[in-house]
Protein backbone atom coordinates (compact mmCIF):
# COMPACT_ATOMS: atom_id res chain seq x y z
CA UNK A 1 0.00 0.00 0.00
CA UNK A 2 2.85 2.34 0.88
CA UNK A 3 4.48 1.73 -2.52
CA UNK A 4 1.23 2.31 -4.43
CA UNK A 5 0.57 5.56 -2.59
CA UNK A 6 4.12 6.75 -3.23
CA UNK A 7 3.83 5.92 -6.94
CA UNK A 8 0.57 7.85 -7.24
CA UNK A 9 2.07 10.86 -5.49
CA UNK A 10 5.16 10.77 -7.72
CA UNK A 11 2.91 10.90 -10.77
CA UNK A 12 0.76 13.67 -9.31
CA UNK A 13 3.79 15.76 -8.36
CA UNK A 14 4.73 16.06 -12.03
CA UNK A 15 1.50 17.97 -12.72
CA UNK A 16 2.33 21.71 -13.10
CA UNK A 17 -0.94 22.99 -11.62
CA UNK A 18 -0.44 20.85 -8.52
CA UNK A 19 2.95 22.41 -7.89
CA UNK A 20 1.28 25.81 -8.10
CA UNK A 21 -1.43 24.60 -5.71
CA UNK A 22 1.26 23.39 -3.32
CA UNK A 23 2.86 26.84 -3.37
CA UNK A 24 -0.49 28.57 -2.85
CA UNK A 25 -1.16 26.52 0.27
CA UNK A 26 1.60 28.43 2.06
CA UNK A 27 -0.68 31.47 2.00
CA UNK A 28 -3.80 29.53 2.97
CA UNK A 29 -2.48 28.03 6.23
CA UNK A 30 -1.98 31.33 8.13
CA UNK A 31 -5.43 32.48 6.99
CA UNK A 32 -7.11 29.28 8.20
CA UNK A 33 -5.16 29.40 11.47
CA UNK A 34 -6.24 33.01 11.99
CA UNK A 35 -9.90 32.12 11.41
CA UNK A 36 -9.66 29.23 13.88
CA UNK A 37 -7.97 31.37 16.51
CA UNK A 38 -10.35 34.33 16.11
CA UNK A 39 -13.38 32.06 16.48
CA UNK A 40 -11.93 30.42 19.59
CA UNK A 41 -10.88 33.77 21.07
CA UNK A 42 -14.31 35.28 20.45
CA UNK A 43 -16.01 32.43 22.28
CA UNK A 44 -13.49 32.31 25.14
CA UNK A 45 -12.92 36.02 25.72
CA UNK A 46 -16.14 37.79 24.69
CA UNK A 47 -18.56 36.01 27.02
CA UNK A 48 -20.33 38.08 29.67
CA UNK A 49 -18.82 37.84 33.13
CA UNK A 50 -21.87 36.42 34.86
CA UNK A 51 -21.49 35.74 38.60
CA UNK A 52 -23.62 32.90 39.93
CA UNK A 53 -25.74 33.51 43.02
CA UNK A 54 -25.97 30.41 45.22
CA UNK A 55 -27.69 31.88 48.30
CA UNK A 56 -28.37 35.12 50.15
CA UNK A 57 -27.31 36.45 53.54
CA UNK A 58 -30.22 38.38 55.03
CA UNK A 59 -28.81 41.12 57.27
CA UNK A 60 -30.24 42.77 60.39
CA UNK A 61 -31.56 45.68 58.31
CA UNK A 62 -33.44 43.39 55.92
CA UNK A 63 -30.94 43.68 53.06
CA UNK A 64 -30.03 40.55 51.07
CA UNK A 65 -26.32 40.11 50.27
CA UNK A 66 -25.56 37.68 47.40
CA UNK A 67 -23.33 34.66 48.03
CA UNK A 68 -21.66 34.15 44.63
CA UNK A 69 -19.12 31.36 45.17
CA UNK A 70 -18.94 27.94 46.71
CA UNK A 71 -16.27 29.28 49.07
CA UNK A 72 -16.78 32.79 50.42
CA UNK A 73 -14.48 34.75 52.69
CA UNK A 74 -16.65 36.92 54.93
CA UNK A 75 -15.27 39.96 56.71
CA UNK A 76 -14.88 43.72 56.86
CA UNK A 77 -11.93 43.81 54.42
CA UNK A 78 -12.44 45.00 50.86
CA UNK A 79 -10.86 41.85 49.45
CA UNK A 80 -13.51 39.60 50.99
CA UNK A 81 -16.09 37.84 48.84
CA UNK A 82 -18.82 39.06 51.18
CA UNK A 83 -17.94 42.44 52.68
CA UNK A 84 -19.80 43.34 55.89
CA UNK A 85 -19.04 46.83 57.17
CA UNK A 86 -19.63 46.36 60.90
CA UNK A 87 -17.01 47.40 63.50
CA UNK A 88 -17.34 44.15 65.50
CA UNK A 89 -16.64 41.99 62.43
CA UNK A 90 -12.95 41.22 61.74
CA UNK A 91 -11.30 42.01 58.42
CA UNK A 92 -11.27 38.28 57.68
CA UNK A 93 -13.86 36.72 59.93
CA UNK A 94 -15.28 33.47 58.54
CA UNK A 95 -15.54 31.20 55.51
CA UNK A 96 -18.96 30.14 54.21
CA UNK A 97 -18.66 26.96 52.10
CA UNK A 98 -21.09 25.17 49.81
CA UNK A 99 -20.57 21.49 48.92
CA UNK A 100 -21.51 19.36 45.91
CA UNK A 101 -24.62 18.00 47.64
CA UNK A 102 -25.92 21.52 48.34
CA UNK A 103 -25.03 21.56 52.05
CA UNK A 104 -23.27 24.52 53.71
CA UNK A 105 -20.76 25.05 56.52
CA UNK A 106 -19.37 28.15 58.22
CA UNK A 107 -15.86 28.25 59.74
CA UNK A 108 -14.19 30.78 62.00
CA UNK A 109 -10.79 31.86 60.61
CA UNK A 110 -9.32 33.42 63.73
CA UNK A 111 -11.77 36.28 64.19
CA UNK A 112 -11.90 38.39 67.35
CA UNK A 113 -15.67 38.39 67.69
CA UNK A 114 -16.25 34.69 67.07
CA UNK A 115 -18.91 32.82 65.09
CA UNK A 116 -22.23 31.51 66.41
CA UNK A 117 -24.83 29.37 64.65
CA UNK A 118 -28.33 29.57 66.15
CA UNK A 119 -26.85 31.05 69.32
CA UNK A 120 -24.11 28.45 69.85
CA UNK A 121 -20.47 29.45 69.42
CA UNK A 122 -18.56 27.26 66.96
CA UNK A 123 -15.25 26.93 65.14
CA UNK A 124 -16.95 25.08 62.29
CA UNK A 125 -20.57 24.09 61.89
CA UNK A 126 -23.06 22.82 59.33
CA UNK A 127 -25.53 25.53 58.32
CA UNK A 128 -29.01 24.98 56.88
CA UNK A 129 -31.18 27.49 55.11
CA UNK A 130 -33.00 29.56 57.72
CA UNK A 131 -30.24 29.22 60.33
CA UNK A 132 -28.92 32.37 61.97
CA UNK A 133 -25.18 33.01 61.65
CA UNK A 134 -23.83 35.52 64.15
CA UNK A 135 -20.54 37.20 63.23
CA UNK A 136 -19.10 39.42 65.95
CA UNK A 137 -22.56 39.72 67.46
CA UNK A 138 -24.23 40.71 64.16
CA UNK A 139 -26.89 38.24 63.03
CA UNK A 140 -27.42 37.05 59.44
CA UNK A 141 -29.75 34.41 58.02
CA UNK A 142 -28.80 32.05 55.19
CA UNK A 143 -31.59 32.26 52.59
CA UNK A 144 -31.86 30.05 49.46
CA UNK A 145 -32.45 31.45 46.01
CA UNK A 146 -35.92 30.76 44.67
CA UNK A 147 -36.66 28.43 41.77
CA UNK A 148 -37.67 31.44 39.71
CA UNK A 149 -34.37 33.21 40.45
CA UNK A 150 -32.51 30.02 39.54
CA UNK A 151 -34.43 29.73 36.26
CA UNK A 152 -33.80 33.37 35.30
CA UNK A 153 -30.11 33.10 36.20
CA UNK A 154 -29.70 30.01 34.00
CA UNK A 155 -31.63 31.60 31.12
CA UNK A 156 -29.43 34.71 30.88
CA UNK A 157 -26.06 32.97 31.19
CA UNK A 158 -23.83 32.72 28.12
CA UNK A 159 -23.71 29.42 26.25
CA UNK A 160 -20.37 28.75 24.52
CA UNK A 161 -22.14 27.56 21.37
CA UNK A 162 -24.21 30.73 20.98
CA UNK A 163 -22.65 33.05 18.39
CA UNK A 164 -19.64 30.84 17.58
CA UNK A 165 -20.60 27.22 17.06
CA UNK A 166 -17.67 24.93 17.97
CA UNK A 167 -18.55 22.42 15.22
CA UNK A 168 -17.92 25.05 12.54
CA UNK A 169 -14.57 25.95 14.11
CA UNK A 170 -13.69 22.27 14.20
CA UNK A 171 -14.56 21.99 10.50
CA UNK A 172 -12.09 24.81 9.75
CA UNK A 173 -9.47 22.94 11.77
CA UNK A 174 -10.22 19.71 9.90
CA UNK A 175 -9.74 21.55 6.58
CA UNK A 176 -6.42 22.88 7.89
CA UNK A 177 -5.38 19.33 8.84
CA UNK A 178 -6.38 17.80 5.49
CA UNK A 179 -4.49 20.45 3.53
CA UNK A 180 -1.46 20.12 5.83
CA UNK A 181 -1.53 16.35 5.35
CA UNK A 182 -1.64 16.74 1.55
CA UNK A 183 1.28 19.17 1.51
CA UNK A 184 3.34 16.95 3.80
CA UNK A 185 2.63 13.91 1.63
CA UNK A 186 3.79 15.87 -1.42
CA UNK A 187 6.97 17.05 0.31
CA UNK A 188 7.97 14.04 2.43
CA UNK A 189 8.64 10.36 1.80
CA UNK A 190 6.70 8.60 4.59
CA UNK A 191 3.32 9.18 2.96
CA UNK A 192 1.50 6.26 4.58
CA UNK A 193 2.64 7.18 8.09
CA UNK A 194 1.67 10.82 7.53
CA UNK A 195 -1.82 9.94 6.27
CA UNK A 196 -2.35 7.54 9.16
CA UNK A 197 -1.20 10.06 11.77
CA UNK A 198 -3.44 12.85 10.53
CA UNK A 199 -6.34 10.43 10.13
CA UNK A 200 -5.93 9.37 13.77
CA UNK A 201 -5.68 13.01 14.89
CA UNK A 202 -8.88 14.00 13.05
CA UNK A 203 -10.69 10.92 14.38
CA UNK A 204 -9.69 11.67 18.00
CA UNK A 205 -10.88 15.27 17.90
CA UNK A 206 -14.27 14.41 16.38
CA UNK A 207 -14.76 11.48 18.76
CA UNK A 208 -14.08 13.78 21.71
CA UNK A 209 -16.45 16.38 20.28
CA UNK A 210 -19.14 13.73 19.82
CA UNK A 211 -18.61 12.53 23.40
CA UNK A 212 -19.10 16.10 24.62
CA UNK A 213 -22.36 16.46 22.72
CA UNK A 214 -23.59 13.16 24.15
CA UNK A 215 -22.84 14.52 27.62
CA UNK A 216 -24.61 17.84 26.80
CA UNK A 217 -21.34 19.83 26.86
CA UNK A 218 -21.18 22.57 24.24
CA UNK A 219 -17.85 24.25 25.01
CA UNK A 220 -15.04 22.92 22.81
CA UNK A 221 -12.89 26.01 22.21
CA UNK A 222 -10.12 25.18 24.69
CA UNK A 223 -9.86 21.70 23.19
CA UNK A 224 -9.88 23.11 19.64
CA UNK A 225 -6.85 25.27 20.47
CA UNK A 226 -5.11 22.19 21.88
CA UNK A 227 -5.86 20.19 18.73
CA UNK A 228 -4.69 23.09 16.53
CA UNK A 229 -1.34 23.26 18.32
CA UNK A 230 -1.08 19.46 18.25
CA UNK A 231 -1.68 19.56 14.49
CA UNK A 232 1.30 21.87 14.05
CA UNK A 233 3.31 19.52 16.25
CA UNK A 234 2.35 16.52 14.11
CA UNK A 235 3.40 18.48 11.00
CA UNK A 236 6.81 19.14 12.55
CA UNK A 237 7.30 15.45 13.37
CA UNK A 238 6.19 14.38 9.88
CA UNK A 239 8.88 16.59 8.39
CA UNK A 240 11.65 15.91 10.89
CA UNK A 241 11.17 12.40 12.28
CA UNK A 242 8.22 10.41 10.85
CA UNK A 243 9.30 7.36 12.83
CA UNK A 244 8.14 9.14 16.00
CA UNK A 245 4.56 9.53 14.75
CA UNK A 246 3.30 6.29 16.32
CA UNK A 247 4.68 7.32 19.69
CA UNK A 248 3.06 10.74 19.38
CA UNK A 249 -0.33 9.24 18.47
CA UNK A 250 -0.18 6.98 21.52
CA UNK A 251 0.84 9.95 23.69
CA UNK A 252 -2.03 12.01 22.27
CA UNK A 253 -4.55 9.27 23.04
CA UNK A 254 -3.08 8.89 26.53
CA UNK A 255 -3.18 12.65 27.05
CA UNK A 256 -6.86 12.86 26.11
CA UNK A 257 -7.62 9.92 28.42
CA UNK A 258 -5.73 11.67 31.25
CA UNK A 259 -7.59 14.90 30.48
CA UNK A 260 -10.98 13.18 30.76
CA UNK A 261 -9.93 11.31 33.92
CA UNK A 262 -8.82 14.55 35.59
CA UNK A 263 -12.00 16.32 34.47
CA UNK A 264 -14.02 13.51 36.08
CA UNK A 265 -11.94 13.83 39.26
CA UNK A 266 -12.20 17.62 39.47
CA UNK A 267 -15.96 17.75 38.91
CA UNK A 268 -16.35 16.44 42.48
CA UNK A 269 -14.47 18.83 44.77
CA UNK A 270 -14.49 16.44 47.72
CA UNK A 271 -13.00 13.68 45.56
CA UNK A 272 -10.30 16.05 44.29
CA UNK A 273 -9.41 17.13 47.84
CA UNK A 274 -9.09 13.50 48.98
CA UNK A 275 -6.69 12.74 46.12
CA UNK A 276 -4.58 15.84 46.74
CA UNK A 277 -2.19 14.36 49.31
CA UNK A 278 -1.74 11.05 47.48
CA UNK A 279 -1.00 12.79 44.17
CA UNK A 280 1.40 15.23 45.86
CA UNK A 281 3.29 12.37 47.52
CA UNK A 282 3.46 10.48 44.22
CA UNK A 283 5.02 13.53 42.57
CA UNK A 284 7.84 13.91 45.07
CA UNK A 285 8.53 10.14 45.10
CA UNK A 286 8.69 10.13 41.30
CA UNK A 287 11.27 12.93 41.26
CA UNK A 288 13.32 11.24 43.98
CA UNK A 289 13.36 8.07 41.88
CA UNK A 290 14.49 10.19 38.93
CA UNK A 291 17.37 11.60 41.00
CA UNK A 292 18.48 8.09 41.99
CA UNK A 293 17.86 6.13 38.80
CA UNK A 294 17.53 8.76 36.08
CA UNK A 295 19.31 8.75 32.73
CA UNK A 296 21.30 11.80 31.64
CA UNK A 297 20.57 13.33 28.22
CA UNK A 298 21.92 16.65 26.93
CA UNK A 299 23.42 17.50 30.31
CA UNK A 300 20.28 16.96 32.41
CA UNK A 301 19.47 13.80 34.35
CA UNK A 302 15.73 14.19 33.78
CA UNK A 303 14.86 10.95 31.98
CA UNK A 304 13.86 7.51 33.22
CA UNK A 305 14.03 4.30 31.21
CA UNK A 306 11.50 1.50 31.71
CA UNK A 307 12.39 -1.18 29.19
CA UNK A 308 11.86 0.27 25.71
CA UNK A 309 9.97 3.29 27.08
CA UNK A 310 11.69 6.49 28.20
CA UNK A 311 9.85 9.39 29.81
CA UNK A 312 10.43 12.60 31.76
CA UNK A 313 9.00 12.38 35.30
CA UNK A 314 9.22 16.16 35.70
CA UNK A 315 6.42 16.55 33.13
CA UNK A 316 4.06 14.36 35.15
CA UNK A 317 5.08 16.11 38.37
CA UNK A 318 3.71 19.40 36.98
CA UNK A 319 0.21 17.99 37.45
CA UNK A 320 1.11 16.76 40.94
CA UNK A 321 2.47 20.21 41.78
CA UNK A 322 -0.84 21.85 40.86
CA UNK A 323 -2.71 19.39 43.07
CA UNK A 324 -0.34 20.29 45.92
CA UNK A 325 -0.79 24.02 45.41
CA UNK A 326 -4.55 24.06 44.90
CA UNK A 327 -6.53 24.26 48.11
CA UNK A 328 -9.93 25.23 49.40
CA UNK A 329 -10.43 28.64 51.02
CA UNK A 330 -10.92 27.17 54.47
CA UNK A 331 -7.47 25.53 54.37
CA UNK A 332 -5.83 28.57 52.78
CA UNK A 333 -6.44 30.53 55.96
CA UNK A 334 -4.11 28.26 57.99
CA UNK A 335 -0.33 28.79 58.31
CA UNK A 336 0.30 25.04 58.35
CA UNK A 337 -1.06 24.76 54.81
CA UNK A 338 1.25 27.52 53.55
CA UNK A 339 4.31 26.02 55.25
CA UNK A 340 3.65 22.58 53.77
CA UNK A 341 3.28 24.02 50.26
CA UNK A 342 6.53 26.01 50.57
CA UNK A 343 8.36 22.90 51.80
CA UNK A 344 6.90 20.82 48.96
CA UNK A 345 7.95 23.43 46.38
CA UNK A 346 11.46 23.59 47.82
CA UNK A 347 11.76 19.79 47.64
CA UNK A 348 10.61 19.77 44.00
CA UNK A 349 13.05 22.50 42.94
CA UNK A 350 15.84 20.85 44.94
CA UNK A 351 15.36 17.57 43.06
CA UNK A 352 15.35 19.43 39.73
CA UNK A 353 18.58 21.20 40.66
CA UNK A 354 20.22 17.85 41.45
CA UNK A 355 19.07 16.64 38.02
CA UNK A 356 20.51 19.76 36.29
CA UNK A 357 17.02 20.44 34.88
CA UNK A 358 17.10 24.19 35.44
CA UNK A 359 14.60 25.01 32.69
CA UNK A 360 11.89 22.99 34.43
CA UNK A 361 12.98 24.40 37.80
CA UNK A 362 12.30 27.91 36.46
CA UNK A 363 8.81 26.82 35.37
CA UNK A 364 8.07 25.39 38.81
CA UNK A 365 9.43 28.46 40.57
CA UNK A 366 7.35 30.95 38.57
CA UNK A 367 4.30 28.73 39.06
CA UNK A 368 5.09 28.65 42.78
CA UNK A 369 5.11 32.47 42.87
CA UNK A 370 1.73 32.70 41.14
CA UNK A 371 0.24 29.98 43.33
CA UNK A 372 1.69 31.47 46.52
CA UNK A 373 0.31 34.91 45.69
CA UNK A 374 -3.16 33.49 44.98
CA UNK A 375 -3.01 31.58 48.26
CA UNK A 376 -1.84 34.51 50.42
CA UNK A 377 -1.93 37.80 48.48
CA UNK A 378 1.23 38.75 50.37
CA UNK A 379 3.85 40.58 48.27
CA UNK A 380 6.33 40.61 51.16
CA UNK A 381 6.36 36.80 51.26
CA UNK A 382 6.89 36.67 47.51
CA UNK A 383 9.75 39.17 47.75
CA UNK A 384 11.45 36.99 50.35
CA UNK A 385 10.98 33.92 48.13
CA UNK A 386 12.47 35.72 45.12
CA UNK A 387 15.46 36.94 47.14
CA UNK A 388 16.12 33.48 48.56
CA UNK A 389 15.86 31.87 45.16
CA UNK A 390 18.15 34.50 43.65
CA UNK A 391 20.80 33.62 46.23
CA UNK A 392 20.32 29.90 45.49
CA UNK A 393 20.63 30.66 41.78
CA UNK A 394 24.01 32.32 42.32
CA UNK A 395 25.23 29.22 44.18
CA UNK A 396 23.97 26.97 41.38
CA UNK A 397 25.82 28.98 38.75
CA UNK A 398 28.94 28.87 40.91
CA UNK A 399 28.97 25.11 41.44
CA UNK A 400 27.19 23.78 38.32
CA UNK A 401 29.37 24.31 35.22
CA UNK A 402 26.61 23.04 32.90
CA UNK A 403 24.24 25.79 34.01
CA UNK A 404 27.00 28.38 33.85
CA UNK A 405 27.77 27.50 30.22
CA UNK A 406 24.12 28.06 29.32
CA UNK A 407 24.19 31.53 30.84
CA UNK A 408 27.66 32.37 29.50
CA UNK A 409 26.52 32.09 25.87
CA UNK A 410 23.34 34.09 26.49
CA UNK A 411 23.31 37.26 24.35
CA UNK A 412 26.63 36.13 22.81
CA UNK A 413 25.51 33.38 20.43
CA UNK A 414 26.80 35.13 17.29
CA UNK A 415 30.24 35.37 18.87
CA UNK A 416 30.13 31.58 19.36
CA UNK A 417 28.28 30.67 16.16
CA UNK A 418 30.34 27.54 15.52
CA UNK A 419 30.40 26.26 19.12
CA UNK A 420 27.97 26.92 21.97
CA UNK A 421 25.81 29.28 19.92
CA UNK A 422 25.49 26.98 16.91
CA UNK A 423 21.87 25.92 17.44
CA UNK A 424 20.46 29.37 18.15
CA UNK A 425 22.27 31.13 15.31
CA UNK A 426 21.02 28.50 12.84
CA UNK A 427 17.53 28.79 14.27
CA UNK A 428 17.48 32.56 13.78
CA UNK A 429 18.81 32.23 10.24
CA UNK A 430 16.06 29.71 9.45
CA UNK A 431 13.40 32.04 10.87
CA UNK A 432 14.67 34.75 8.53
CA UNK A 433 14.80 32.42 5.52
CA UNK A 434 11.24 31.21 6.09
CA UNK A 435 9.77 34.69 5.85
CA UNK A 436 6.11 35.30 6.63
CA UNK A 437 4.73 32.26 4.78
CA UNK A 438 7.50 29.66 5.04
CA UNK A 439 9.38 27.51 2.55
CA UNK A 440 6.81 24.73 2.55
CA UNK A 441 6.39 21.51 4.51
CA UNK A 442 9.49 19.31 4.43
CA UNK A 443 11.59 21.94 2.65
CA UNK A 444 13.39 23.40 5.63
CA UNK A 445 17.01 23.03 6.69
CA UNK A 446 16.72 23.32 10.48
CA UNK A 447 15.69 19.67 10.82
CA UNK A 448 19.36 18.75 10.41
CA UNK A 449 20.19 20.62 13.65
CA UNK A 450 19.93 18.77 16.97
CA UNK A 451 16.74 19.33 19.02
CA UNK A 452 15.09 21.21 16.14
CA UNK A 453 11.72 19.57 16.81
CA UNK A 454 11.83 20.21 20.58
CA UNK A 455 13.91 23.12 21.91
CA UNK A 456 13.95 25.00 18.57
CA UNK A 457 10.47 24.10 17.35
CA UNK A 458 9.38 27.75 17.06
CA UNK A 459 12.12 28.32 14.47
CA UNK A 460 11.24 25.01 12.77
CA UNK A 461 7.63 26.13 12.26
CA UNK A 462 8.70 29.63 11.20
CA UNK A 463 11.03 28.21 8.53
CA UNK A 464 8.67 25.66 6.97
CA UNK A 465 5.23 27.15 7.74
CA UNK A 466 6.06 30.83 8.05
CA UNK A 467 6.54 33.37 10.82
CA UNK A 468 2.83 34.23 10.75
CA UNK A 469 1.84 30.70 11.72
CA UNK A 470 4.58 30.56 14.36
CA UNK A 471 3.30 33.79 15.92
CA UNK A 472 -0.27 32.43 15.85
CA UNK A 473 0.98 29.43 17.86
CA UNK A 474 2.11 31.83 20.57
CA UNK A 475 -1.17 33.74 20.29
CA UNK A 476 -3.09 30.49 20.85
CA UNK A 477 -1.36 29.98 24.21
CA UNK A 478 -2.01 33.65 25.04
CA UNK A 479 -5.74 33.16 24.36
CA UNK A 480 -5.83 30.24 26.82
CA UNK A 481 -4.09 32.39 29.44
CA UNK A 482 -6.45 35.33 28.86
CA UNK A 483 -9.43 33.01 29.21
CA UNK A 484 -8.11 31.85 32.59
CA UNK A 485 -7.67 35.47 33.72
CA UNK A 486 -11.34 36.12 32.89
CA UNK A 487 -12.62 32.86 34.36
CA UNK A 488 -10.73 32.68 37.66
CA UNK A 489 -12.63 35.51 39.45
CA UNK A 490 -15.88 33.64 38.74
CA UNK A 491 -14.55 30.28 39.91
CA UNK A 492 -16.76 28.34 42.28
CA UNK A 493 -13.86 27.31 44.52
CA UNK A 494 -10.37 28.59 45.23
CA UNK A 495 -9.22 25.03 44.45
CA UNK A 496 -10.35 25.46 40.84
CA UNK A 497 -9.13 29.06 40.61
CA UNK A 498 -5.62 28.23 41.84
CA UNK A 499 -5.47 25.10 39.68
CA UNK A 500 -6.44 26.97 36.51
CA UNK A 501 -4.05 29.85 37.20
CA UNK A 502 -1.18 27.45 37.89
CA UNK A 503 -1.86 25.43 34.72
CA UNK A 504 -1.99 28.60 32.61
CA UNK A 505 1.24 29.83 34.21
CA UNK A 506 3.05 26.61 33.27
CA UNK A 507 1.85 26.88 29.65
CA UNK A 508 2.82 30.56 29.37
CA UNK A 509 6.23 30.21 31.02
CA UNK A 510 7.08 27.20 28.85
CA UNK A 511 6.13 29.16 25.73
CA UNK A 512 8.16 32.20 26.76
CA UNK A 513 11.25 30.15 27.62
CA UNK A 514 11.02 28.15 24.39
CA UNK A 515 10.46 31.09 22.01
CA UNK A 516 12.73 33.64 23.67
CA UNK A 517 15.42 31.01 24.22
CA UNK A 518 15.38 30.21 20.50
CA UNK A 519 16.01 33.85 19.52
CA UNK A 520 18.53 34.48 22.35
CA UNK A 521 16.35 36.89 24.32
CA UNK A 522 16.57 34.39 27.19
CA UNK A 523 19.03 31.54 27.85
CA UNK A 524 18.21 28.35 25.95
CA UNK A 525 16.86 26.08 28.69
CA UNK A 526 15.63 23.06 26.71
CA UNK A 527 11.99 23.70 27.59
CA UNK A 528 9.35 22.42 25.17
CA UNK A 529 6.62 24.40 23.40
CA UNK A 530 3.23 23.16 24.73
CA UNK A 531 1.51 20.68 22.36
CA UNK A 532 3.94 21.44 19.51
CA UNK A 533 7.35 20.09 20.54
CA UNK A 534 8.04 16.43 19.89
CA UNK A 535 7.78 14.42 23.09
CA UNK A 536 5.26 12.01 24.55
CA UNK A 537 5.77 13.05 28.19
CA UNK A 538 5.25 16.70 27.33
CA UNK A 539 2.10 16.02 25.28
CA UNK A 540 0.66 13.86 28.06
CA UNK A 541 1.30 16.61 30.61
CA UNK A 542 -0.17 19.55 28.71
CA UNK A 543 -3.41 17.67 28.03
CA UNK A 544 -3.59 17.02 31.77
CA UNK A 545 -3.10 20.73 32.47
CA UNK A 546 -6.12 21.55 30.29
CA UNK A 547 -8.38 19.76 32.80
CA UNK A 548 -7.60 22.40 35.44
CA UNK A 549 -8.45 25.18 32.98
CA UNK A 550 -11.74 23.47 32.11
CA UNK A 551 -12.60 23.07 35.80
CA UNK A 552 -12.66 26.87 36.14
CA UNK A 553 -14.94 27.30 33.11
CA UNK A 554 -18.37 28.18 34.54
CA UNK A 555 -20.03 29.11 31.24
CA UNK A 556 -23.37 27.43 30.68
CA UNK A 557 -22.89 23.68 29.97
CA UNK A 558 -19.33 24.36 28.79
CA UNK A 559 -17.14 21.96 30.70
CA UNK A 560 -17.00 18.21 31.27
CA UNK A 561 -15.15 19.06 34.51
CA UNK A 562 -18.31 20.74 35.89
CA UNK A 563 -21.33 18.66 36.86
CA UNK A 564 -24.68 19.06 35.11
CA UNK A 565 -28.00 18.58 36.90
CA UNK A 566 -30.53 15.84 36.25
CA UNK A 567 -31.24 14.82 32.68
CA UNK A 568 -34.45 16.78 32.55
CA UNK A 569 -32.73 20.15 32.99
CA UNK A 570 -30.77 22.16 30.49
CA UNK A 571 -28.52 24.22 32.71
CA UNK A 572 -25.79 23.67 35.23
Language model region names:
Residues 1-86, 100, 147-156:
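Intrinsically disordered, low-complexity acidic Ser/Thr-rich regulatory segments
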Residues 120, 125, 522-563:
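Transmembrane alpha-helices of multi-pass inner-membrane enzymes
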Residues 66-139:
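Forkhead-associated
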Residues 11-15, 116-161:
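C-terminal boundary/linker segments immediately following FHA domains
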Residues 54-60, 559-572:
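Short, highly charged, low-complexity non-transmembrane loops/tails of multi-pass membrane proteins
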Residues 191-420, 459-520, 544-548, 563-572:
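Hydrophobic alpha-helical transmembrane segments of multi-pass inner membrane proteins, especially
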Residues 435-468:
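Long extracytoplasmic/lumenal interhelical loops at the membrane interface
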Residues 157-172, 218:
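N-terminal membrane topogenic signal
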Amino acid sequence: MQEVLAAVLDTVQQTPWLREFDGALRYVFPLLALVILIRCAKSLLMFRREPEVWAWLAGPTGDHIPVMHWENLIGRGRGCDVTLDYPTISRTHAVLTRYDDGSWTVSDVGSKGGVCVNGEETAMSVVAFGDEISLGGVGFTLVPITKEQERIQAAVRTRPDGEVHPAVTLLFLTLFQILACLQLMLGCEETGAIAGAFGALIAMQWLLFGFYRMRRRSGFDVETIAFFLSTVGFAVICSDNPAALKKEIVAMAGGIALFLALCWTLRDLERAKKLRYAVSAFGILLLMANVLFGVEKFGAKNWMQLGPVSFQPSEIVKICFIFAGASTLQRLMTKRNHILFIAYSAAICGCLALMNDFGTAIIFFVTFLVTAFMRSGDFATLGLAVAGTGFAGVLVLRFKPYAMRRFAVWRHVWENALTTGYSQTRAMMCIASGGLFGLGAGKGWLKYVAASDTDLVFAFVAEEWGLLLAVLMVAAVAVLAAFVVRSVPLGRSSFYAIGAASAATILVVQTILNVFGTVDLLPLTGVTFPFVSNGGSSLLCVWGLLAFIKAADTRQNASFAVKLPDRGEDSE
